[in-house]
Amino acid sequence: MKVTFEQLKEAFNRVLLDACVARETADACAEMFARTTESGVYSHGVNRFPRFIQQLDNGDIIPEAQPQRVTTLGAIEQWDAQRSIGNLTAKKMMDRAIELASDHGIGLVALRNANHWMRGGSYGWQAAEKGYIGICWTNSIAVMAPWGAKECRIGTNPLIVAIPSTPITMVDMSMSMFSYGMLEVNRLAGRELPVDGGFDDDGRLTKEPGTIEKNRRILPMGYWKGSGLSIVLDMIATLLSNGSSVAEVTQENSDEYGVSQIFIAIEVDKLIDGATRDAKLQRIMDFITTAERADENVAVRLPGHEFTRLLDENRRNGITVDDSVWAKIQAL
């Protein structure tokens, strides 16, 4: 089915107000969920909203909480999220990293006791729109087996890197081949994954999203490389924030809350003039996109460049929402 941005936001806002979230907070949170969905990231927008409300009802998310600064060390700050609403707090933390970068050329905010930030790409994009390089990542509950193991002991720990090119170039990727949210999107659409995304119950690689959702044997991105990167991202976020690691979140909490996150902004214009920056970025993009195509009908793409097109299409034609997901939200 198709809905408008206004219908989405109104539905989210109603549920949040019914959950006794303060009006101003509910409006800001509903706006972010609707913007994420409008951008085409359904897995961490409309599809994730019922799970968000479940955690709100369970007390994992404390809607009235506000993040508190703990430590300042020049361009680095350490904050405690106090288990506040994840997407609203993440936006504030990237804003703070940008402020630090304006003073120091680079800003780093390490956040502990945080909640799921929904679409991580929103915060990298936020920095790039203002002319900064944006880098951020989060750890998570253990939902992936390290390479060579069967048990989930590492997080998907998504990493975002956004570059202020025209259009913005951005990588937004979990350390698994697919996030669990994207497994759900493909399952709801009745689609196989385009490439292997995990293991079946017999330990064979599979493209069947429902199987991977059930057995939790998701495939690390790049096999052992994604497994290793997940581990070091967790270590850095834990140390810089003095927060919880994947092990602590998994073993000590009843659900995924109290995670650790990193937000970095770099002011490129302190290092290179605007004209030179634009020329260098354009040369990189042209060099890549003019490569001979493997399939003459499929263009060579740069990461993140499709988001502007998706946003325009959804604004023009309406936002596609799975019927069963919309029914869940209406029933909340």
From Swiss-Prot:
Keywords: Cytoplasm, NAD, Oxidoreductase. GO terms for cellular component: cytoplasm. The active site is at H44. This is 2,3-diketo-L-gulonate reductase. Belongs to the LDH2/MDH2 oxidoreductase family. DlgD subfamily. Its main location: cytoplasm. Catalyzes the reduction of 2,3-diketo-L-gulonate in the presence of NADH, to form 3-keto-L-gulonate. PANTHER family: 2,3-DIKETO-L-GULONATE REDUCTASE, OXIDOREDUCTASE-RELATED. NAD(+) binds at I168, T169, M170, V171, D172, M173, S174, W224, K225, G304, H305, E306.
